[in-house]
Amino acid sequence: MKSFLLLLVCLTYSLDAFYLPGLAPVNFCEKEQSSNTCPNAVPLFVNKLDSDQSVIPYEYHSFDFCTVSEEDSPVENLGQVLFGERIRPSPYNISFIENKQCSFLCEKEYKSGDAEDKRRLKLLQRGMKLNYQHHWIIDNMPVSFCFTNQQQFNVCLPSFPMGCYVTPDGRPKDACVLDNRYDKPDSYYLFNHVDILVEYRDLSHDSNMFDHKVGGRVIRIKVIPRSIKHTDKNSLNCGETAVPQPISVTDENMKVLYTYSVMWKPTDVKWSSRWDYLLDSIPHTNIQWFSIMNSLVIVLFLSGMVGMILLRTLHRDIARYNQLDNEEDAQEEFGWKLVHGDVFRPPQSAMFLSVFVGTGTQLLLMSSITLAVACFGFLSPANRGSLMTFALVWYVLLSVVSGYVSARLYKTMEGLAWKTNILLTAFFVPGILFGIFFVTNLMLWAKESSAAVPFGTLVALLSLWLFLATPLTFIGSFFGFKGDRVIAPVRTNQIPRQVPEQTLYTKPLPGMLMGGILPFGCIFIQLFFILNSIWAHQVYYMFGFLALVFLILIVTCSEATILLAYFHLCAEDYHWWWRSFLTSGFTAAYLFLYCIHYFTSKLTITGTISTILYFAYTGIFVFLFFLATGTIGFFATYLFIHKIYSSVKVD
């Protein structure tokens, strides 16, 4: 009951707790009233540009836009660096409640015979063709691009396009469909003008909140990008009838003038609710409520059935076995009791099983702690990069748990190569992850992407692994091997029992296929939204739902694996160690198939490098998910088998 109430609280706070960690509002004042605590200048920061057609993001200055000195750039945390965020100051001059109309920003000139100018123009064209998106920030709020989609719904996105492209057959793509003037075949229209609408809450007369006059707080920022062909910076025309600015690589010189307009508009929306309009416009958000509850009802119903079957059947079996032990005419054991002398026989490759279970325990605890903190709003989208930073720090700290569990399990399975176990626990899985990460980082370096982790950060990550995670693993392993071995409730025979011929449904592969489908059915809806947040750059904030799905995943993995293990034991197959891990871990195979389906049906990613990067990152995700779900099934089965063989009398 307490867990259920906690989840309800999480569901509530996941929607409204964006500013719990102390992200204080900033008050802005008019120029005459400005001070250190109430500034007049409203800085606009630019971030990376990314695309749903490419996995490779770029820094703002990689394209030939208007820039200023980057000395005053905000310091990114580790999570922001790993996600490729590069927040930089911009040349846009915005002041509180100061409207501007068609202000000149900068001028870019391209000479026909200059190879560097042609390269810059071609990069702009490539960005427009792949629909690269700006990510601007004002007062820690994303600058949003709002439009009406084909279903006549108003959608607001936390990014806006740098331009658009019209195909050679005259078909407008992406943002070109929003204006019928973008109609010239095989043309690139650069959005060199932006109309910025800033909605603010006026606090200057709110005496209940402040004992001194303040101006207001920024609530919403919306932008309308446009393409305008300016001829002279002294005679700018930003009207609705302005001619668009196509970008072409020709033998003629070309000039591009960048301009902007700013309009301030008061609103009654409170500062604490300023994210709502972005979150409410996320596609399919409302569908999630019904789908999650529907899945919850189905899964709980199936879990209840499985639980009752197991409890009633086991209760009858245990009572019958104990009754037969008291009867003098009991000639032969049968059922799962028949394999009591082999059920705790150490498996093959016990070393790798212990390493996988240790790392899986580390991942499960990290996920649990991260979700518990996130569902209360402390790792919200308003706190950029905090989710990845928090998860990575806890992954490193929980290395001590990985070492302890791996060592304790390996000792329980009568393993002798304790040094190898310690080294594999510390280096095997992290080494695979770092190897894939390093190769993908080389690809991003070659593409000069903002997602390429700088050398200093790479050294820092390597140091975290070698000088913090590894010693913690050694410490955990020391205490794991120092502890007593878990004693099995029954003795193990010296000669292994021969496993009889198995039926189709008790063979390993059919069992894994059946054991993985139910847990996957619990997560695939949430998986769609998670993949959208990663690859379609949508905001993900329903951590309360994710925590609930995580709990359901644990329950279904446990019960499905226990049920299949019971059937295998009844069929006199005692090889449950690896099978319990692989049965629930096979959920990762369905996850990988779904990621392939998502790639082919939902994404429009083009290019070999982007495809390689997508499946490399997917491979990391699937591998970690395999370890986590496999660990759930293993521990559930281990506790189940230990319990049932402790409940029967064995001579």
How should each PLM-predicted stretch be described?
Residues 11-293:
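Soluble extramembrane domains flanking the early transmembrane region of eukaryotic membrane proteins
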Residues 10-21, 299-312, 362-378, 398-411, ...:
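Membrane-embedded alpha-helices of multi-pass membrane proteins, especially ion channels
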Residues 249, 601-651:
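TerminUS-proximal long segments
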Residues 229-245, 332-342, 370-374, 399-413, ...:
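Hydrophobic alpha-helical transmembrane segments
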Residues 25-32, 311-337, 370, 377-391, ...:
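Interhelical loop segments of eukaryotic multi-pass membrane proteins
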Residues 330-344, 495-511, 587-589, 651:
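Cytosolic juxtamembrane regulatory segments of multi-pass membrane proteins
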Residues 274-447, 474-483:
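Hydrophobic alpha-helical transmembrane segments corresponding to the first two to three helices
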Residues 2-6, 286-300, 350-362, 382-399, ...:
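Transmembrane alpha-helices of multi-pass eukaryotic membrane proteins
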